[in-house]
Amino acid sequence: MEGSFQSRLQSIIQRTGETTAESTNSWYNRLRTSMPWSNDYTEIPTNASGGNSYFQSSEFSLSRWERYMLFGICLLGSLACYAIACFMFPVLVLKPRKFVLLWTMGSLLAVLGFAIVQGFVAHFRQLTTMERLPITLSYFVTLLATIIATIKIKSTILSIVFGVLHILSFVAYLIAFFPFGTRTVSLGTRMASRSLSNWLP
């Protein structure tokens, strides 16, 4: 009698646990499928061999939505660093290290943003392709030249020159690596020229 009661009690507990687990899983699945990025869950490539990656942990699995969000944060941070550095330029002689720190942080955040959205190895490959290698070299060379002119040479004129060149390289970098950047610029140029031709007599 006692053994029969225990077996019935165990079966009831087991059925209750299975029901709770099923309801929890169904609730979690409904919540996950309701998210806008539920069908876009991908893993950032971290190795040239494709499927085999250096990092197998879940921290390197990001959805497309999450990658775009991090890209936007890095790009806004980069623009903010450049803007603050430009405003600090009048006090460059007094605080050159802060200027260089902001300038370098802005450059690194821009590169990091594109590396996140494209994948680190994929972005490095794009940086070293023949058609984009001049932009890559000009971007990092002008960055290094700005730092040297500010810290080592301590020349305001050279800092301005290399800083302007680096800003131009940064714009070229955005156009080259931003999704549909070249097409957007060409379309904007055509629209601007068409509007200008309509305004001119």
UniProtKB/Swiss-Prot annotation:
Its main location: Golgi. GO terms for cellular component: cytosol; fungal-type vacuole membrane; Golgi apparatus; Golgi membrane. Residues 90-98, 154-159 are lumenal. Keywords: Golgi apparatus, Membrane, Protein transport, Transmembrane, Transmembrane helix, Transport. Residues 1-68, 120-132, 181-201 are cytoplasmic. It is found in: Golgi apparatus membrane. It is a multi-pass membrane protein. InterPro entries: Vesicle_transpt_Got1/SFT2 (IPR007305), Vesicle_transpt_SFT2 (IPR011691). GO terms for biological process: Golgi to endosome transport; intracellular protein transport. The chain crosses the membrane at residues 69-89, 99-119, 133-153, 160-180. Nonessential protein required for the fusion of transport vesicles derived from the endocytic pathway with the Golgi complex. Can be replaced by got1. Belongs to the SFT2 family. This is Protein transport protein sft2. The gene is sft2.
